[in-house]
């Protein structure tokens, strides 16, 4: 009876212990607790999830604004802002465009630049950018977080953090990167160091913050860093 009562108490206490795992590793049998990250939490770490059929652009933009500029915005906030100057009927059928994103960013005092770049210069992109890709026949906007020699890391508003082979990424990418520029950019933001895929043992390259000179080459100005 005593054991059954103890089990019942542990079950009732379960919700308050969610996300933690007890580890008996201390001398004398003391218990410590370690935060446990679910597969879903890891998949969408640092990303804004897409909630509607037409809002991948808004979710991708909100991800960059939250993580790289520490702005308190979510997908709904960005959608409302972009709809002010967008064709709402066109948005419902085709989604937002990069022009809609550009107008929204300018309305909040930021800048946007679109660059057409080739595969050979992909490694020169040192900031998180919005890109349009086709994955499994589905075209939508994602955040390109980081490019390496053989891999490209993306933050997909629907699928979460993904690592694509360079060839797979290039096959679905239209060659354009959309950069968000402005004051308060965090040069060590989390998007530049995406989660290691669950199937990978280690990363090939360690994260290194980008210097001012590299950022200015991409469109930032000196006052953005103060």
Swiss-Prot record:
Disruption phenotype: Deletion of just fapD in an overexpressing strain yields cells without amyloid fibrils. Deletion of the entire fapA-fapF six-gene locus shows no visible growth phenotype. The keyword Coiled coil does not apply. Changing residue 56 to A: The fapABCDEF operon longer secretes FapC. Its EC number is 3.4.22.-. GO terms for cellular component: membrane; periplasmic space. One of its GO terms (molecular function) is ATP binding. Keywords: ATP-binding, Hydrolase, Nucleotide-binding, Periplasm, Protease, Signal, Thiol protease. Residues 1-18 form the signal peptide. InterPro entries: Peptidase_C39. It is found in: Periplasm. GO terms for biological process: proteolysis. Belongs to the FapD family. This is Probable functional amyloid protease FapD. It comes from Pseudomonas fluorescens.
């Amino acid at each position: 009876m005593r054991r059954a009562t103890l089990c019942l108490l542990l079950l009732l206490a379960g919700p308050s212990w969610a996300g933690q795992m007890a580890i008996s590793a201390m001398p004398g049998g003391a218990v410590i607790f370690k935060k446990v990250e679910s597969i879903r939490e890891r998949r969408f770490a640092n990303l804004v999830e897409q909630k509607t059929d037409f809002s991948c652009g808004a979710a991708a933009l909100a991800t960059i604004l939250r993580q790289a500029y520490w702005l308190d915005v979510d997908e709904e906030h960005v959608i409302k802002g972009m709809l002010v100057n967008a064709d709402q009927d066109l948005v419902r059928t085709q989604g937002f465009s990069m022009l809609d994103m550009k107008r929204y960013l300018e309305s909040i005092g930021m800048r946007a630049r679109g660059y057409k770049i080739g595969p050979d210069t992909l490694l020169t992109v040192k900031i998180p950018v919005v890109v349009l890709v086709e994955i499994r026949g589905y075209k939508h906007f994602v955040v390109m977080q980081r490019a390496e020699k053989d891999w490209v890391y993306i933050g997909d508003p629907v699928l979460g953090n993904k690592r694509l082979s360079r060839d797979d990424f290039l096959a679905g990418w239209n060659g354009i990167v959309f950069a968000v520029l402005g004051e308060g950019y965090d040069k060590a933001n989390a998007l530049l160091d995406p989660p290691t895929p669950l199937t990978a043992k280690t990363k090939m390259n360690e994260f290194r913050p980008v210097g001012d000179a590299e950022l200015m080459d991409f469109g930032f100005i000196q006052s953005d860093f103060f």
